[in-house]
Amino acid sequence: MKSQKLPRCLAAAALLSLTTAIASAQAQTWPAKAVRIVVGFSAGGPTDVVARAFAEHAARALGQPVIVDNKPGANTILAAEAVASAPADGYTLLLAATNHTMIPALYSARVKFDAVRSFAPVCTLAVSPTVLVTGPAMPAKTLGAFMQQVRETPGQRSYGTPGTGSSGHFASEQFLRMTGLSMNHIPYKGAAQVVTDVIGGQLDSSFATLGSVLPQIQAGKLTALAVASSRRSTLLPQVPTFAEAGVKGYSADAWYGLLVPAGTPAPVLQALEKVAVQFTEQAGTVARLQGMGMEAQHTCGQAFGRDMDRDTRAYIKLAGELQLKAE
């Protein structure tokens, strides 16, 4: 019996060695064909725009076509599943956004992948700071005045979001828990009407991504009280961070970044990271993203992975406290 097992073990070891050698050789020659970037949103949105801008740069840098594949549906779960189950060879990428780390908090029973461990993080490409904006219904011009008015009228002031469980909802509730304030949540089906109603006075405030409200701020229709970043936005240098305004430790940037299937060879990850960093440092990229209220910014590899893991845990905890369920 032992004599039969030994050849089998040797054969298995030889097969594993051969498979590893083939994978290594393929990684060294990557890319030898077109690369696909899967996006969980329809064409035209911020995630899609970042993906297409990166695809143009990557195609030039890699010498191969880089194709954007829009796969909207199920709050980006369909796109994430497609990439998580794809071969870990560097030819299928996911352009993910902040909501990717919210999936476990809202859909853990429905998904077939782990939002963190089923993927290898490459780099973030851009961030869009979250900004607290108010309209005519809320005359406060500073974060301190806003907090004082909310404190004096507990439960009477409102904030709007694109929907229950959205990034705006999580950002708002994190702020309220940190400050001990109470406000009414008014969920909408999309961000556009939220902005319209803050401007019109039907809503007091909203925590919105800067890209979605920058034109209205610049036109004086909305007042920006603070940005939820570690430093001031280059697009709104006159607006303080929450820390500068007295709420330390609060951060709610919306990020856009590249993920690949877990197990992707290190040489491929290194090559992708190099291309991603080059992309964020190009003057053309910086200008293009600024035009959409975004900032080119890269956090790569393990640091990106740690940020994702931290955020995922925080969203799971907050969703439990709020008893949130996916709509």
Sequence positions of predicted segments:
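A ligand-binding cleft/hinge motif common to bilobed small-molecule-binding domains
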Residues: 100-108, 176-178, 205-239
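Bacterial N-terminal signal peptides
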Residues: 11-21
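An extracytoplasmic/periplasmic, membrane-proximal ligand-sensing/linker region
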Residues: 32-34, 177-181, 266-327
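N-terminal secretory signal peptides that target proteins for export/translocation
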Residues: 1-5
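N-terminal (or domain-start) structured segment
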Residues: 26-116, 156, 164, 180-205, ...
